[in-house]
Amino acid sequence: IFPGLGQWYNKSPLWKIGLFSGIEVVSILSGMQWVKKADKIRVDYELFADGNWDLETWVYNTLSTPIGNYADVHIDGTHKLTLKLSGALAEQFGTYVTSDSLEDNAHWVYTGEVSVLRDRDFYENIGKYDQFVGGWTDCYGQGNNQQWFEVYKDVGDSVETIITTPSKEDYVDQRAQSNDYLNMAKFAISAVMFNHVISAMDAVWSTQSSNRPKKEKKVKTDVGLLYDKFSRFGVGGVSISLYW
């Protein structure tokens, strides 16, 4: 039931009808707008990554330059990218392999028969893990001058060293902004859910109050949230029961 409808049926004050219906409309429209903004930024940062992160550059920098001296910067690491092969490589090894295959086959990137699958994991990994920092094309400038640098992050009981570049920093900031909008959209969804619960409780309470002088029977209510293990927040819906 749309929040405010129960109040209208019970002939509640207009301010109460407007409050519940207004919260509903504003929350839904705000959530949709924030999701739209998050998606636009996502498209932008993916295009940015497509133009500034390169598989051949990653292999070369990781294996042949000082950036590869860091413990977390190597080809065969904890995390992997999916590679798509074509031509003779695909005939021999199949269409898809993981990026650790390049540890012993770095020459593949020069054959023109291998590309990186730019899926959701790819766009997350290149910004999140030092292992892939060598793929950012601004690790070194035109004069082969070093442009990557260290950033120190306090993680409580220790300090984490992050290897980054100007482009990677920009990319991470864009992803963070997109995620901020998504989090705001989640809050809007929560506002809608709680607005439904409170509106329903108010409607039931108003019904009880209006009927009590006319009937000896008391109407008892039970309002609760339904658990759903497949739901992101564990909430599958709202349960409202009336007993008389």
Where are these regions (language model features)?
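Alpha-helical transmembrane signal-anchor/signal-peptide segments
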Residues: 37-50
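Solvent-exposed, amphipathic alpha-helical segments
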Residues: 3-4, 174
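Hydrophobic alpha-helical topogenic segments used for membrane insertion/localization
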Residues: 1, 18-32, 188-201
